[in-house]
């Protein structure tokens, strides 16, 4: 079996070469990303392996099928960069990473919150230049504040437990609430509008769909308290409207 890798980084080559020693798959690596312009690089392959920045839209999938590709393997959990309908029509199987460590993503979300609140990213550059002034770097104690979590799946549940350890009140919103988990964790489900209104920190942990894309828009930000922090590991805020709120001293997003 011959597999073409697109968007390859050095760590991809190192990891897959090590694992492939037990399987003997013929692998060819390309640093360039898959798209309609460089799809000929997949000529002669049985499968292609792609990542989040590759594009397997309908025209690209059609060309892959014409060249005999029968499998698209994603090195990620998300699959919004693949036209699944086109793949099905051409008889191409699509597989993906079923899940990441929920603790790793939850801990990263906390790192984003702390960086946004305490301006760690700005302080880093200042101290490199020997500037230890605190002006513009002050945040607030997370202990005693309110966190709003949108979506309460595996990652969010790990995050909620961490934030409860910080001594925070945690509000949650989910179309399918799990009241048993809420009681066990000390989290309270509330309507989304109330979550926006009451939260000091908001973290989004919901699938990227047409409904959730840019869900932190002007209307949502307008409901938040001034100074609310919003952390999104999944890129949901509308940066245009968030920028306007930043300039008026309101919510900040990372």
Feature names for model-found ranges:
Residues 213, 218, 222, 226-254:
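Rossmann-like dinucleotide-binding domain for NAD(H)/NADP(H)
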Residues 28-34, 52-53, 126-135, 183-189, ...:
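Short gly/ser/thr-rich secondary-structure transition/capping motifs
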Residues 66-71, 90-92, 168, 226-229, ...:
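A short helix->loop->beta-strand "cap" motif at the edges of active sites that frequently abuts
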Residues 2-93, 217:
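An N-terminal-biased, well-structured beta-alpha scaffold segment characteristic
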Residues 135-226:
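Rossmann-like dinucleotide/phosphate-binding beta-alpha-beta segment
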Residues 90-92, 98-146, 158-161, 165:
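Phosphate-binding beta-alpha-beta segment of Rossmann-like dinucleotide-binding domains, i.e.
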């Amino acid at each position: 079996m011959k597999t073409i890798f697109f968007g390859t980084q050095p760590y991809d080559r190192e990891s897959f070469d090590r694992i492939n020693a037990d399987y003997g798959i013929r692998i060819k690596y390309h640093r360039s990303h898959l798209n309609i312009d460089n799809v000929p690089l997949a000529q002669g392959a049985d499968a292609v392996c792609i990542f989040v920045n590759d594009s397997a839209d309908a025209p690209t999938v059609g060309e892959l099928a014409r060249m005999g590709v029968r499998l698209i393997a994603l090195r990620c959990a998300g699959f919004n960069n693949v036209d699944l309908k086109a793949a099905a029509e051409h008889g191409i199987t699509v597989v993906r990473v079923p899940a990441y460590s929920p603790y790793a993503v939850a801990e990263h979300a906390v790192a984003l919150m702390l960086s946004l609140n305490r301006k760690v990213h700005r302080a880093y550059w200042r101290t490199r230049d020997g500037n230890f002034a605190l002006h513009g770097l002050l945040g607030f104690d997370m202990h005693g504040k309110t966190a709003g979590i949108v979506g309460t799946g595996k990652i969010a549940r790990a995050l909620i437990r961490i934030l409860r350890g910080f001594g925070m009140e945690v509000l949650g919103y989910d179309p399918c609430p799990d009241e048993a988990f809420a009681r066990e964790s000390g989290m309270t489900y509330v309507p989304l509008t109330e979550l926006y209104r009451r939260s000091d920190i908001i973290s989004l942990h919901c699938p990227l769909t047409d409904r959730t894309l840019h869900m932190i828009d002007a209307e949502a930000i307008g409901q938040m308290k001034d100074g609310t922090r919003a952390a999104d590991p999944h890129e949901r805020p509308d940066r245009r409207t968030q920028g306007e709120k930043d300039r008026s001293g309101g919510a900040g997003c990372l």
